[in-house]
């Protein structure tokens, strides 16, 4: 018999797991990892910003995509991938970053999907589904940390220097600033580890004596708030 068990801690863990997965996915797909120095739409490198060529703007660069302003372009800003193939990503460090982040995000999305069904199923192969998911989240967090540590090592690539100036180098941004996607990825990584720790509390909440009493009474829907 399937028992639907809902507790504050289990629902909070499910919600946080989904938020962690989506925050990492959105950050990975975004072009706002780096915000370049101000320049005119058709100007070259000039730390002075605006020129007679047009109003100054700041292009953005992601792991595999970018946003630039194109003169006479109807939409003003053109966003899309600069790398058609994996080998065209700005540097080997960013290629490694993409691999580790993708692996971590894949695990987080799998856990987020599974977490939705933890109200009905609390074990898998005689193992607590919360503990298994918590372990997967911890592994995903390690992948994310490795990816985020490798990411700044690619700041010395030629592609980054086009956006950040010639002074940019590994772990030095030059004229760029970190965009919201980078900070979102950092926050998602921290949240990932919090979810891994909190999964133990979700397991305790769904296997408490109060829950067992409700099951013995024959209830199929158990809601403990």
Curated annotation (Swiss-Prot):
The keyword Ligase does not apply. GO terms for biological process: development of primary female sexual characteristics; development of primary male sexual characteristics; positive regulation of fertilization; single fertilization. The keyword ATP-binding does not apply. Its main location: membrane. It is a multi-pass membrane protein. GO terms for cellular component: membrane. Gene3D superfamilies: 1.20.140.150. It is found in: Membrane. Belongs to the LHFP family. Plays a role in fertility. Involved in distal reproductive tract development. This is LHFPL tetraspan subfamily member 2a protein. It comes from Danio rerio (Zebrafish). The lineage of its organism: Eukaryota, Metazoa, Chordata, Craniata, Vertebrata.
